[in-house]
Amino acid sequence: MITFSELLLKLQDFWAKQGCTIVQPYDFPSGAGTFHPATFLKSLDSKPWATAYVAPSRRPTDGRYGENPNRLGAYYQFQVLIKPSPDNIQDLYLKSLEALGLDWRKHDIRFVEDNWESPTLGAWGLGWEVWLDGMEVTQFTYFQQVGGFECDPVAVEITYGTERLAMYLQEVESVFDIVWSKNGGHIVTYADVHKRGEFEYSRYNFEVADTKMLFDWFEDASRECKRCLEEKLPLPAYDYCLLASHIFNTLDARKAISVTERQNFILKVRELAKGCAEVYKESLGELSEA
């Protein structure tokens, strides 16, 4: 049986053999692998780029106090970005499943059309959800626009739902029963690693977070992002864009933002992301290509 740790390592090994540069998770909280600079910023220029990485992801509104076997406020995506998109990308994906020990020919694999959008990143793309015996396990996206700019060449993003794949491969009904690792004769489960965190962060995000402080932090992060952009520093600016996005998500979980305000906050983060994209492209001398 493949452990969760082995699953991540096998995906890294497979995509490294396909020519992807393996980078490390980014050290700012974000809601998806797309937010990593290795995807968001690198998809903006015209140079070929292929990368893969584990993406710890936080979505405060999805927390369930560690009581739901299928919903988490923090989890792991595995992200692949290849630009330009290879013609055989679907075949490569199916081979990656084989590398995990899954014979896809014996299962019902479906590519279901599902176009993707990230309002806060000003990004959207055409693509599919990949369903394995009726369960979504992966998202394919051909980026059309990122940070409000057209993508040329078009990059393909593959986002694996690693916990769902692990549950399927290990034949367990709860994410907390996933075997994280086997250390000698000792088994470490997903619950051992993350269940307490799911409870505490759910309580924080839904009940405890200081909303006044977070509103102030959002304004501070936005202001610092813009200041960095004025200094033509898109990478530090993007860090503060990520911070503003995470603070917004926490305020959203805390129900501190009305429906009308929510749209305004999304637009504010989108403008920060667009500013980062614009200054980044400008620094490469590619703004005219947007």
Curated annotation (Swiss-Prot):
Pfam families: tRNA-synt_2e. It catalyses: tRNA(Gly) + glycine + ATP = glycyl-tRNA(Gly) + AMP + diphosphate. Keywords: Aminoacyl-tRNA synthetase, ATP-binding, Cytoplasm, Ligase, Nucleotide-binding, Protein biosynthesis. One of its GO terms (biological process) is glycyl-tRNA aminoacylation. PANTHER family: GLYCINE--TRNA LIGASE, CHLOROPLASTIC_MITOCHONDRIAL 2, GLYCYL-TRNA SYNTHETASE. The keyword Aminoacyl-tRNA synthetase applies. The lineage of its organism: Bacteria, Pseudomonadati, Campylobacterota, Epsilonproteobacteria, Nautiliales. One of its GO terms (cellular component) is cytosol. It comes from Nitratiruptor sp. (strain SB155-2). Tetramer of two alpha and two beta subunits. One of its GO terms (molecular function) is ATP binding. It comes from the Bacteria. InterPro entries: aa-tRNA-synth_II/BPL/LPL, Gly-tRNA-synth_heterodimer, Gly-tRNA_ligase_asu. CDD domains: GlyRS_alpha_core. Belongs to the class-II aminoacyl-tRNA synthetase family. Its EC number is 6.1.1.14. It is found in: Cytoplasm. This is Glycine--tRNA ligase alpha subunit.
